[in-house]
Amino acid sequence: MSCPVIELTQQLIRRPSLSPDDAGCQALMIERLRAIGFTVEHMDFGDTQNFWAWRGQGETLAFAGHTDVVPAGDVDRWINPPFEPTIRDGMLFGRGAADMKGSLAAMVVAAERFVAQHPDHQGRLAFLITSDEEASAKNGTVKVVETLMARNERLDYCLVGEPSSTEIVGDVVKNGRRGSLTCNLTIHGVQGHVAYPHLADNPVHRAAPMLNELVAIEWDQGNEFFPATSMQIANIQAGTGSNNVIPGELFIQFNFRFSTELTDETLKERVHALLDKHQLRYTVDWWLSGQPFLTARGKLVDAVVNAIEHYNEIKPQLLTTGGTSDGRFIARMGAQVVELGPVNATIHKINECVNAADLQLLARMYQRIMEQLVA
């Protein structure tokens, strides 16, 4: 199949960029962008490769994404080696095809076509690309954003190429994401022999009423943009492995996916109040992965909706569901942030694939968004 979007996607898939290794993907993109007049700035931190590229000046539309992928898993279960892209029945198979090398290829080809038609475009077109999104996400987009903010870079609109669609490309776009807050809680007791409970203090027994109350709390009711805040216990650990020892500590890890109805500080206060109410001895460590963000209807959302309606003749759903994305960092710059990418049904799975025709369509959508905002 001779299509520049498919060809570039295949070239990117052939580079086994297991997070945070870029494996040469960014060099491939940079070569194409420099050829059409982009200025490229490398922003590497630790073992992570990032770049910020721009062309023109004025109102800025950035396309953001990541070159890294998750491990392939059992390669023997793939219909083809995961880093050897193949097309079967119109589907392009390969690790990263949907998440998100297809989007990266569509962005680059869209930029090439846009610049060819609008060499003197009015606004600034930019790219923010990282190799650290799938793993720790500590040296990737967040560090680039901090650098850009420190020098007062302008970023008005950002389109993240995460695979947002569910059945056909463009049926769902994400105009926000919930916040993510993790609590690592240790309840302290006194270890002892199970036959002498009066000489010990079992932290599991102590914590049980608190846990029962914790899981029953309705944190909020959500709002028109976000579902209700969710709390899920992810890990519980206690005991020595012996059946005759009362444990001295209980470790509980739980995560909140929270809406704009709450702040991380409010959640922390409510958890601490619950622990104190039950008179527990505890230590707690909090990790805020990201604040919730929302892009209301405006120029970017309207441009994205217009592009989808024009090329796919459907009206997309605007949702904030799912996990976190690098959009949470970019939103700090005050930018309108929207995620639009291919169908996500096979991401992170064996035999990850994407409809090849969808990638061609996605490139056209990206180009039309550019034309509406920075032409």
From Swiss-Prot:
Binds 2 Zn(2+) or Co(2+) ions per subunit. Pfam families: M20_dimer (PF07687), Peptidase_M20 (PF01546). Pathway: Amino-acid biosynthesis; L-lysine biosynthesis via DAP pathway; LL-2,6-diaminopimelate from (S)-tetrahydrodipicolinate (succinylase route): step 3/3. Zn(2+) 1 binds at H66, D99, E162. It comes from the Bacteria. PROSITE patterns: ARGE_DAPE_CPG2_1, ARGE_DAPE_CPG2_2. One of its GO terms (molecular function) is acetylornithine deacetylase activity. The keyword Hydrolase applies. CDD domains: M20_DapE_proteobac (cd03891). Keywords: Amino-acid biosynthesis, Cobalt, Diaminopimelate biosynthesis, Hydrolase, Lysine biosynthesis, Metal-binding, Zinc. Transmembrane segments: none annotated. Zn(2+) 2 binds at D99, E134, H348. The active site is at D68, E133 (proton acceptor). It catalyses: N-succinyl-(2S,6S)-2,6-diaminopimelate + H2O = (2S,6S)-2,6-diaminopimelate + succinate. The keyword Signal does not apply. Its EC number is 3.5.1.18. Catalyzes the hydrolysis of N-succinyl-L,L-diaminopimelic acid (SDAP), forming succinate and LL-2,6-diaminopimelate (DAP), an intermediate involved in the bacterial biosynthesis of lysine and meso-diaminopimelic acid, an essential component of bacterial cell walls. Homodimer. Belongs to the peptidase M20A family. DapE subfamily. This is Succinyl-diaminopimelate desuccinylase. It comes from Citrobacter koseri (strain ATCC BAA-895 / CDC 4225-83 / SGSC4696). The gene is dapE.
